[in-house]
Design a protein with these regions (language model features):
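Multi-pass membrane glycosyltransferase architecture that uses lipid-linked
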Residues: 1-244, 248-250, 280-417
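Alpha/beta-hydrolase-fold enzymes
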Residues: 252-255
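Juxtamembrane membrane-water interface segments that cap and precede transmembrane helices
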Residues: 96-105, 257-276
Length: 417
């Protein structure tokens, strides 16, 4: 992409970001709430336009690694074993989808984004379904035009989109008492990538405790079926495959505290190595502690949607490893809950993504790298701000961050012991 074209696209994305912010927090524009058909048409049009502009500029993980997983499936090979280490560390749900996408005969940079695009349209519907009824149409519109989903889904083509859609659908099913369906959807979400396990506490929060065993039993079915399919369809050596499956790591040294440590010369950058492994372990411990604290402190005070958003924000605050697509995780949930603090995160995270995809990624530089690291500190501060601290006050009413609709109460108001 030439400099002039990049500047034009940057201007367009800034305009979209301004529109999203305008329709969320500014005066009469906050009332903009088109019908679902109009919102979906705009969402589809924007995503197709970004896909077209991004053609030949798709990041290498989707352009190369994800394509390789589909090719491996078509050759009856296990992507866990034939791809280089850290390029694929998940169950074969998406490689099966990638194989189907390759079979369409479309150029991969189009075909590989079909599933994420369709999933993101489902998310556009679900954010309205999970929001308060009077806010449903407005929240759908805000998600449809927000630049962060546009970039992660249509520019990057990341599989966060189906994971988010399935996780939201699991919350929707649990809220409506469809326990078995909620468990199956949760299991499918975890089958796409590992991180949607963060939806599990929220699903349980919306489910009466006597039905928790049903959630667990149905949630394990999709992963077990996928594991059973691997030796049959992919000729997997299950011992080796399971070791690779359990070795996933995020890219360390580019975000938050590990990014600052790398700039100071104390940490390397990447997925593994002598200057990375200790910090990966520290990051894992920090994540587990942070998630545990969120559940212990906020369980009786939040709905399933709010609890899930808090868990994702806490993860982003303390994680050692990071990918730009992680920023998408809490976006739909924060739009559902609403509030100005949520929009501080939604705005800064969008700015980070615009800079990463449209400035840093096409032409990496030391200066841009430093901007991203220090910019991550601002996004982390926004994530901390977006946590529902006001709920810690005795007898606090839902206000500020929370404006989401609460379903009829369940029997889960006490701490899960």
């Amino acid at each position: 992409m030439g400099a002039a074209a990049l500047l034009i696209f940057l201007a367009v994305m800034v305009g979209i970001a301004a529109l999203a912010l305008l329709t969320s927090v500014v005066g009469p524009a906050r009332l903009l709430a088109p019908p679902l058909s109009v919102t979906l048409a705009v969402a589809l049009g924007l995503r197709l336009a970004v896909m077209a502009i991004a053609f030949h500029h798709t990041p290498y993980d989707v352009a190369l690694w994800f394509r390789s997983t589909g090719e491996a499936v078509l050759q009856h090979q296990d992507p866990l074993l034939v791809l280089p280490r850290y390029e694929w560390n998940f169950l074969p749900a998406m490689p099966y989808v990638h194989a189907l996408e390759l079979s369409t005969g479309l150029p991969w940079e189009i075909a590989g984004k079909l599933c994420p695009l369709l999933a993101d349209l489902v998310t556009t519907v679900l954010v309205g379904t999970l929001a308060a009824p009077e806010r449903a149409a407005r929240v759908r519109w805000q998600y449809a035009v927000h630049p962060l989903p546009l970039l992660v889904v249509a520019w990057h083509g990341q599989i966060e989109a189906p994971a988010v859609a399935l996780g939201l659908a699991a919350l929707w099913a649990a809220r409506r008492g469809r326990t078995g369906v909620g468990g199956l959807l949760l299991g499918l979400a975890v089958s796409v990538k590992t991180w949607p396990v963060l939806f599990a506490p929220g699903v349980l929060r919306e489910t009466p405790r006597r039905r928790w065993p049903l959630v667990a039993a149905t949630a394990v079915l999709p992963p077990l079926l996928l594991l059973a399919s691997m030796p049959l369809l992919l000729g997997s050596d299950m011992g080796r495959s399971l070791r690779v499956l359990g070795s996933y790591r995020g890219n360390t040294g580019i975000w938050g505290w590990t990014g600052i440590q790398r700039l100071a010369g104390n940490v390397g950058q990447g997925f593994g190595g002598p200057r990375i492994d200790p910090y990966q372990r520290m990051g894992l411990i920090a994540v587990l502690v942070a998630l545990g604290l969120v559940v212990l402190v906020f369980w009786p005070r939040l709905t399933g949607v709010e609890l899930t958003a808090a868990l994702m924000l806490a993860f982003l605050v303390v994680t050692a490893g990071f990918g730009s697509q992680y920023l998408l995780w809490p976006v739909a949930l924060l739009m559902i809950t609403g509030g100005w603090r949520a929009w501080v995160y939604l705005t800064l995270a969008a700015g980070y993504a615009v800079f990463f995809y449209l400035v840093y990624f096409p032409a990496p530089s030391i200066a841009a790298d430093r901007v991203l690291v220090w910019g991550s500190v601002l996004v982390i501060a926004a994530a901390l701000l977006a946590l529902p601290w006001e709920r810690l006050r005795p007898e606090s009413r839902p206000a500020g961050l929370r404006s989401s609709w609460r379903a009829p109460p369940t029997a889960n108001d006490e701490l899960p012991i």
